[in-house]
Amino acid sequence: MLNQLLKHREALLGAVIVLMVAAIGSRVPSFISPGNLVEMFNDTSILIILALGQMMVLLTKGIDLSMAANLALTGMIVALINFHYPDVPVWALLILASALGLLMGAINGLLVWKLGIPAIVVTLGTMSIYRGIIFLLSGGGWVNSNQMGADFLGLPRASVLGLPVLSWCAIAVLLLVGYFLRYSRTGRALYTAGGNATAAYYTGINAGKMQFVSFCLSGLLAGFCGYLWISRFAVAYVDVANGFELQVVAACVIGGISTMGGTGRVLGCLFGALFLGVINNALPVIGISPFWQMAISGTVIVIAVLLNERGNKRKGRLILRDAALARQKLAVKS
């Protein structure tokens, strides 16, 4: 029974989200108003984008714990540029933030690929380095909303067809990553590199290079979110998004992306982020304390990890079965 549910994990998670929203809406009708649902999706948009970046790293058996620090550093840099050089257009700052994020991701990827250092060690180190650079650049100070230009602050809040631009950014990234992973050769190689290193080797896929690519893409999306976060919340300081990387990893795990690599879908990643978004928005509405919110989120994460492990064991048994069948066929032919 459980194995059947795991086969349809995204559908199950989507149903749970709908039931949660309906249950809370029955107690607080304003919670399911169109305006609040749009705002809730908008609040979750940055988490969705970052989770998609993290997903690509996890697919290759890596992990990027420096995403939030990357976001904070790129956000501080573009905020300082906007303050000192207000004539620089927002589109240029957005490109700069994305490029800086990609560079930081490339540093992570090179250290993992060329030096063979475990990803968790590399990204823990660069996380601290990036936070330290923020302190050096800002002197420990803040960049507040009154020091930011109207255009800088206005882009994520602008509305297009009833949705804020920030939400459209999340939708666009979702579609692009989905297409990339499903239809591009490099996207499919990420799955192979993390799911079956032997198969990757014999098909000419360099698993280390694929990890490098995944870190570059993760860094690119983190840098992109650097501008989005700072402009949305209208403040830049050293501890921006501190600890948010754990929410990002949690969204991936809940969505069925395996920390063992090679398993996971974009839809699951989306639902994992939305699940956390609903919890973060709903529990305060019904009067549950922040401590219980953390406990509930932690419990859900543990359950998701256990389910993922069960799925990984089942996948491993299938691989062994297929290998045994292949050997039998070869023996018969010989």
Language model features with spans:
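Helix-loop-helix "hairpin" substructures at the membrane interface of multi-pass membrane proteins
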Residues: 88-93, 97, 103-108, 112, ...
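Cytosolic-side transmembrane-helix boundaries in multi-pass membrane proteins
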Residues: 1-18, 202-209, 283-334
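Transmembrane alpha-helical segments in multi-pass inner-membrane proteins
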Residues: 222, 232-297
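Loop-to-transmembrane alpha-helix initiation sites
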Residues: 42, 119, 163-170, 211, ...
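Transmembrane helix-bundle core of multi-pass membrane transporters
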Residues: 7, 119-183, 210, 232-241, ...
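Short loop segments and helix-boundary regions at transmembrane helix junctions
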Residues: 2-5, 58-63, 84, 102-145, ...
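Structural signal for alpha-helical transmembrane segments and their membrane-water exit/capping regions
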Residues: 16-32, 135-138, 178-185
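Single transmembrane alpha-helix segments in multi-pass membrane proteins
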Residues: 20-86, 110-117, 252, 256-266, ...
